[in-house]
Amino acid sequence: MSNRVVCREASHAGSWYTASGPQLNAQLEGWLSQVQSTKRPARAIIAPHAGYTYCGSCAAHAYKQVDPSITRRIFILGPSHHVPLSRCALSSVDIYRTPLYDLRIDQKIYGELWKTGMFERMSLQTDEDEHSIEMHLPYTAKAMESHKDEFTIIPVLVGALSESKEQEFGKLFSKYLADPSNLFVVSSDFCHWGQRFRYSYYDESQGEIYRSIEHLDKMGMSIIEQLDPVSFSNYLKKYHNTICGRHPIGVLLNAITELQKSGMNMSFSFLNYAQSSQCRSWQDSSVSYAAGALTVH
């Protein structure tokens, strides 16, 4: 056994967001300073994973709800964009680099998850190609900077899970979600609309295309706020909305359902919604972003 520390580089720095630490810090600070925090700290958040010029201000609404003084472990659940995966995968590295500071993976929790036999390992190549987890690392580092040596991360790449697998993983993660010192970050964009995404749902009663997209997204968002995994699955089957993080969201909803059985009282609220551009013609395209937080009462 070698004791060499293996690092995942910040492979999207310099393209999806700035590679300059001071510049990145100033941008994140700017976005966070424009946002209100709610009264209760978040136990879980849903936030987008696009380039920061598109979604940085939206994501701030979720990260503003994180309380660094109580958070000790951060589970980051992101969808797989590049490799076919029918389960969930764990990283094979020790450290995730960011332009702000390095984040340590929690090898103790990784050991517990690995023992279940429900996970596979992703290669370093897969890890560095994937942006769905990485785009949350600078925001995580920024939100936690006052306690930077006191927390670990648990990155999980979520595959194209069946409903029964979402339930199984939800059950597994529910015991971690029950712990107030854990935070779950669920990585998802919302509707990807236009020819390049092969998705062009349009409800003409809504008027302009972008309004139809917003109506469709907000229908899904209100179902997520009801914390009902079955209704969310049915919504996706009916409208096929291109929500890329639907499986991580499904896992979170199933974990919540599991905790509600034992009487835990939780609520989820979306705090911001945005679109990369406003579609008005069939030639246009856009991606939607939403940020929200789960609180425990």
Swiss-Prot record:
Q: Which family does it belong to?
A: Belongs to the MEMO1 family.
Transmembrane stretches, start-end: none
Which species is this record about? Rattus norvegicus (Rat)
Reading the lineage from the top rank, the first entry is: Eukaryota
* In-chain residues carrying the UniProt-annotated modification Phosphotyrosine: 210
- GO biological-process terms attached to the record: regulation of microtubule-based process
What InterPro entries is this protein classified in? MEMO1_fam
Assembly with partners or alone = Interacts with ERBB2 phosphorylated on 'Tyr-1250'.
Role description: May control cell migration by relaying extracellular chemotactic signals to the microtubule cytoskeleton. Mediator of ERBB2 signaling. The MEMO1-RHOA-DIAPH1 signaling pathway plays an important role in ERBB2-dependent stabilization of microtubules at the cell cortex. It controls the localization of APC and CLASP2 to the cell membrane, via the regulation of GSK3B activity. In turn, membrane-bound APC allows the localization of the MACF1 to the cell membrane, which is required for microtubule capture and stabilization.
Name the keywords, alphabetized.
Phosphoprotein
Name of the protein in its database record: Protein MEMO1
